[in-house]
Amino acid sequence: MTRMIFRNWLAWLIAAPVCLCALVPLTASAQTSAVKNKLVFQVSDAEPQKWNLALNNAKNVQDDLGAGAVQIEIVVYGPGIGMLKQDSVAGNRVADALKAGVTIVACENTMTVQKLVKDDMLPAIGYVKAGVVELMKKQQEGYAYIRP
């Protein structure tokens, strides 16, 4: 009888860690799927090709990962501010990106220097005091930084 109890106890002692180890990958994958990817783009060039490249990259990431699986912000400042003006050649693409859930913000410091007001800008964009500071904060928050 003692021998049987010892065998049962020994079998349990060996089986328990194996069962627990089998659960670890399930827990890890559940945590991974809850993690949201975060991406911040810098647009500070005056060339529409660069604007379109940033917008293409944002769309491609959403298409690949799923729009709900990634947070994307495009920070526009300096000579790139033309991307967000009412008469921008990229205006329709900016509107499409906003509808797709991409956050697009204009630097108010740049707007002040260029004597632009919010009425000069595309509707539905956001604003930040300083574009460079916004990029820094986003990187500190774990956003991957891209400059097309």
Identify the residue ranges that each predicted region occupies.
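Secreted/extracellular ectodomain signature
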Residues: 27-148
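N-terminal targeting/trafficking signals and adjacent low-complexity tails
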Residues: 8, 15-16, 30
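Bacterial N-terminal signal peptides
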Residues: 12-25
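Residues in intrinsically disordered, low-complexity segments of regulatory proteins
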Residues: 8-11, 50
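N-terminal secretory signal peptides that target proteins for export/translocation
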Residues: 1-7
